[in-house]
């Protein structure tokens, strides 16, 4: 806890190792953010706590590595996108946080990601120089978000109205994407016409002075970056490159904490690859060559159907995008997790009449369409398997059996029943099925995380103690030795 010239540090954190190194950094940072300059009122507490939280991440950039900082900031950002509006009651702006959430997730953790985005918006050199000057200008005095905005505008020569309007004064999180890219050969160079999009997670907001980094990758997987700026919901930018880009990426190095989470890697071995933050699993069944794979989880609703279909609802909350190099030549499948939990798909599902499917389009110019798939699980929690995973965008949707034209979508077939009792439960729960079985019982929580795996050996009953589990909905799958789900049920832990 910060007190001027006397920062309190808990005894338990002095334990002879580095496990509380982050806390030491956080509290020490209050010598500047909180003591030297303090927030003008409690609603602006992010100027104290958000900046100290940023410091507790950023010190690892220099002490350990830039990749360590990037990974830990990304973990923090993922938690904000998924949970902050739940733990803090709603989407909150940073400058007017209610007193009951003064020390909540938005102030601390989202505050840190906004500082991260501000650093990359200005550039690190300008950012650190400007913040040192800000601390001197307001030394031993209070400052508000408006004060910081105006000071940075005057000091850097850049109008910070747009940035603060989008990131500080508006609830939710901006979302930036590339709608399309057109490449033309011009002599020995390549001209790239970029068409850009802006959305917003949580609230409807347009804003201006948007900026994010673009990555251009060639056939050898070399990448160069440049920055784009635009106002409003749509933008355009022209870039000249020394090589022909095979792939154009939004924010490839996570320098802007917008409403996306991304994971990328080199795909050079067959097998399963898990993307827990995105609720996705990749199955590489056969590879003809190495490939570069990227999955983006967009935490905003997908574009609407160009021609509405009565009774078909697309997710109002999220969608996925698969991109990469050499992907079309590979034999790939994908598994998408769905759950009506509040942090994922609660706004999509309405009743047991809903039947979940995955829709696909190659790019934003195309219409969403049905693709071969099958489902494992229940109407409100489970997985959808896509039999042929191609580059493009994927979204959850729900439909009923009366909709014409979607009956070809395969859904889960009736499976042997797993009985669970008592259900709901607060402690021990028994699972029973008709015939003895060998394989495993997989427990997945409502966020898509596997919480328990129990081996089964020639048995038709098992008892589990759930007394220490987190409350919520769980999907239970019975899988044979080949990893195929043969039965499932759900339980509620109170």
Set out the residue ranges of the language-model regions:
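C-terminal beta-strand-rich structural cap/linker in extracellular carbohydrate-active enzymes
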Residues: 242-258, 383-403
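Hydrophobic alpha-helical and helix-loop surface patches within well-folded domains
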Residues: 1-195, 202-203, 248
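Proteolytic processing hotspots in large secreted/extracellular or virion-associated proteins
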Residues: 303-357, 362-363
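Beta-strand-rich binding/interaction modules
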Residues: 174-177, 183-231, 237-247, 356, ...
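Short acidic/polar inter-strand loop motif in beta-rich domains
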Residues: 252-263, 481-487
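Residue-level detector of functionally pivotal "anchor" positions at catalytic/ligand-binding pockets or at interdomain
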Residues: 266-267, 398-421
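C-terminal outer-membrane/trafficking sorting elements
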Residues: 410-421, 425-494
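Surface beta-strand/loop "capping" patches
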Residues: 166-205, 268-292, 314-316, 324
């Amino acid at each position: 806890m910060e007190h001027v010239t006397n920062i309190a540090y808990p005894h338990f954190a002095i334990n002879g190792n580095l496990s509380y190194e982050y806390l030491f950094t956080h509290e020490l940072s209050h010598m500047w953010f909180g003591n030297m300059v303090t927030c003008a009122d409690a609603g602006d507490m992010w100027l104290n706590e958000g900046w100290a939280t940023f410091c507790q991440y950023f010190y690892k950039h220099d002490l350990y590595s830039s990749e360590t900082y990037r990974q830990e900031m990304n973990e923090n950002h993922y938690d904000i996108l998924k949970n902050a509006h739940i733990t803090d009651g709603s989407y909150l702006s940073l400058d007017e946080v209610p007193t009951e959430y003064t020390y909540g997730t938005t102030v601390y953790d989202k505050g840190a990601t906004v500082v991260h985005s501000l650093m990359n918006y200005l550039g690190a050199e300008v950012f650190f120089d400007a913040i040192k000057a800000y601390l001197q200008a307001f030394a031993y005095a209070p400052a508000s978000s408006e004060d910081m905005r105006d000071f940075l505008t005057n000091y850097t020569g850049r109008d910070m109205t747009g940035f603060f309007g989008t990131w500080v004064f508006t609830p939710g999180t901006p979302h930036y994407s590339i709608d399309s890219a057109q490449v033309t050969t011009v002599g020995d160079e390549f001209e790239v016409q970029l068409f850009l999009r802006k959305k917003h997670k949580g609230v409807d907001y347009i804003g201006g002075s948007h900026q994010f980094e673009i990555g251009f990758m060639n056939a050898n997987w070399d990448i160069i970056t440049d920055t784009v700026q635009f106002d409003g919901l749509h933008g355009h930018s022209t870039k000249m490159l020394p090589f022909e880009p095979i792939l154009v990426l939004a924010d490839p190095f996570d320098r802007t904490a917008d409403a996306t989470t991304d994971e990328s890697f080199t795909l050079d071995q067959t097998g399963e690859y898990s993307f827990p933050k995105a609720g996705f699993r990749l199955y590489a069944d056969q590879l003809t060559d190495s490939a570069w794979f990227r999955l983006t989880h967009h935490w905003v609703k997908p574009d609407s159907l160009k021609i509405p279909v009565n009774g078909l609802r697309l997710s109002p909350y999220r969608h996925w995008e698969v991109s990469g190099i050499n992907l079309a030549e590979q034999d790939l499948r994908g598994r998408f997790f769905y759950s009506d939990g509040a942090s994922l798909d609660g706004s999509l599902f309405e009743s047991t009449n809903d039947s979940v499917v995955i829709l696909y389009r190659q790019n934003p110019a195309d219409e969403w369409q049905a693709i071969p798939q099958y489902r494992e699980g229940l109407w409100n929690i489970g997985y959808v398997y896509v039999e042929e995973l191609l580059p493009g965008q994927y979204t959850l949707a729900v439909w009923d059996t009366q909709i014409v034209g979607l009956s070809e979508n395969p859904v889960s077939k009736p499976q042997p029943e797993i009985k669970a009792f008592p259900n709901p439960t607060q402690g021990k729960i028994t699972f029973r099925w008709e015939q003895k079985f060998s394989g495993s019982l997989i427990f997945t929580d409502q966020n898509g995380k596997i919480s328990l795996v129990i081996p089964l050996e020639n048995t038709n009953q098992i008892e589990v103690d759930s007394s220490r589990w987190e409350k919520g909905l769980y999907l239970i799958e019975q899988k044979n030795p080949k990893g195929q789900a043969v039965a499932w049920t759900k339980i509620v832990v109170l």
